[in-house]
């Protein structure tokens, strides 16, 4: 059975170092897709690079935890900025869901304005779209527009509640992250997916060159390690040997 493998690099637009790392991993590695933060400091640079790479799938990385929102969000921001206090608000069930739905629509329009096309799919920074309160908003938004959505099926409480016309991969992995970033780790993810009989799989990654913006991230130098592994010739060969076809969310 042919299986579609989407290797999606998150954080396109975060910084020039991030952008260049993603492009390197696409041109000379196994990355096939990326998702962009429309409020990132280097989003215009990302859009410029993407115009030179029309086959690179570019989706939208919905942001509710970093930088300035596109719309006014007094119920979520502090001093005009987004931040990780969203987790506490989710636990307390005090999220401003109307503001979040409006911000999603505004970020989507910003993406179209910057990239000149609709995104191939949606996911989110720090997986906030998988919060139980936010997921229905994003899932309905994606289904109405006919675009795919990253779904961590281990997190969805009731898969039966998903819109019937919502597109996603059968499998998703965020395990290529952290301290163990190796070719062996990547291949274990593929083998586990194949064992489950999944016809499509998304593997999340964050390849980057380190610059001043990336240095401020809690996840910094491992991004360089990811880049090294993802551009390995042996990894590309091992993926092909396992019968995976590289693809984007337009292929599912």
Curated annotation (Swiss-Prot):
A Pfam family hit: YdjC
Sites where the protein binds Mg(2+): 61, 125
Pathway: Glycan degradation; chitin degradation
Keyword Amino-acid biosynthesis: no
Position of the signal peptide: none
Biological process (GO), any one: chitin catabolic process
Alphabetized Gene3D superfamilies for the sequence: Glycoside hydrolase/deacetylase
Gene Ontology CC terms, in alphabetical order: cytoplasm
InterPro entries: COD_ChbG_bac (IPR022948), Glyco_hydro/deAcase_b/a-brl (IPR011330), YdjC-like (IPR006879)
EC assignment: 3.5.1.105
Catalytic reaction list: N,N'-diacetylchitobiose + H2O = N-acetyl-beta-D-glucosaminyl-(1->4)-D-glucosamine + acetate; diacetylchitobiose-6'-phosphate + H2O = N'-monoacetylchitobiose-6'-phosphate + acetate
MF-aspect GO terms: chitin disaccharide deacetylase activity; deacetylase activity; metal ion binding
Subunit structure: Homodimer.
NCBIfam families, per database record: PRK02134.1
Function per UniProt: Involved in the degradation of chitin. ChbG is essential for growth on the acetylated chitooligosaccharides chitobiose and chitotriose but is dispensable for growth on cellobiose and chitosan dimer, the deacetylated form of chitobiose. Deacetylation of chitobiose-6-P and chitotriose-6-P is necessary for both the activation of the chb promoter by the regulatory protein ChbR and the hydrolysis of phosphorylated beta-glucosides by the phospho-beta-glucosidase ChbF.
Protein name: Chitooligosaccharide deacetylase
Organism field: Salmonella heidelberg (strain SL476)
